[in-house]
Amino acid sequence: MTSFPPGSRIGILGGGQLGRMLSLAAAPLGYACHIFGPEADPPAGQVADRVTIADYYDESALSAFASDVDLVTLEFENVPAVCVEFLANVIPVRPSPQSLATAQDRLIEKEFASSIGTGTAPYRAIDSISDLQTAMAQIGPLSVLKTRRMGYDGRGQIILNGSDYLDQAWQDLGEVPSILESFITFDGEISVIAARSLDGSIIAYPPIANQHRNNILNTSRVPASLTTEQTQRAIAIATQIAEALDYVGILAVELFVKGDDFLFNEFAPRVHNSGHWSIEGAVTSQFEQHIRAICGLPLGSTDLLGRAEMTNLIGSDVNQVLTLLAEPGVHLHLYGKTEARDNRKMGHITRIFPKTIRP
């Protein structure tokens, strides 16, 4: 694989807050970023070197974009596959279209995890109401129906408890290809963020404990309260996934904690909300690490600078900014979004505590 030295231009598919923070991390390393996406006035466009506003299916715009950059990465996994494949035919795309395709489809993702020996909740493929009825009889009444595609922040899923509302649930999800998973009563949720470089070297951050509100990540704390053996196993799972995918870049693996064991939930082929604390809380942020990995630079240290806690500012939470800034030691990141809608991530704050003090 080709490495790209400082002075190269990185194309980023998607112009949201992740593209924004990637652009901010790339600049000190000597890289310029060109954002491509359909959204007018994207948050990343406020800090990136260049912006193209065009549809992901616009081949003319994609060709012009590809001719202006040296390599392409992405800020979210729901970029149309045809867009990524079109670009990959003419320019390096990292992570690969194959990694993206695995993450885009929940069934393929679960089958992949199972194929490498990673434990998952029991699941079944659903293509009809008949499939749903059969699957519930096999898995049990307490379950989660999820669309195979376009699911994030709690979207595209319905919790079921019995067969009374199967028809309605199937209709509510649009009667699209789905999976039914057994509902897992877990003790906690963690994520492991790992980076894999062009030469196959891998480094991971300590596991992160996550708490959600309304199915959206609310707070992340690192390091998670795990035993040394659990920490090693969680990192080993993320490492195994990255190696099996021949992955390049930052990868986030979400796991359910159940007793001493872990069950795979999903992976994100990109920088991740649960890693935002790393901007102030680690020697190398996840955003800088991603740039290093995709460009072939040496990976940076993932050592913690203290115990860290990241809290998302969602919707009207952003109105607390002045109060939060009055708190000593709070690090504020606003994403440049103008409208504070319900369930919209407007920014985040990070608090860093001495390693001897538990937040």
Predicted segment positions?
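Short glycine-/aliphatic-rich beta-strand segments at the starts of folded cytosolic domains
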Residues: 303-313
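Phosphate-binding core of ATP-grasp and ATP-grasp-like enzymes
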Residues: 172-226, 231-264, 268-276, 291-301, ...
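ATP-binding N-terminal substructure of ATP-dependent carboxylate-amine bond-forming enzymes
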Residues: 1-108, 130
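Anion (oxyanion) recognition and catalysis
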Residues: 27, 87-88, 114, 137, ...
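Generic C-terminus detector
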Residues: 3, 334-359
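Active-site nucleotide/adenylate-binding loops and adjacent lid/helix of ATP-dependent enzymes
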Residues: 102-191, 195-241, 357
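Short beta-strand-to-loop capping motifs
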Residues: 160-162, 196, 313-316, 349-354
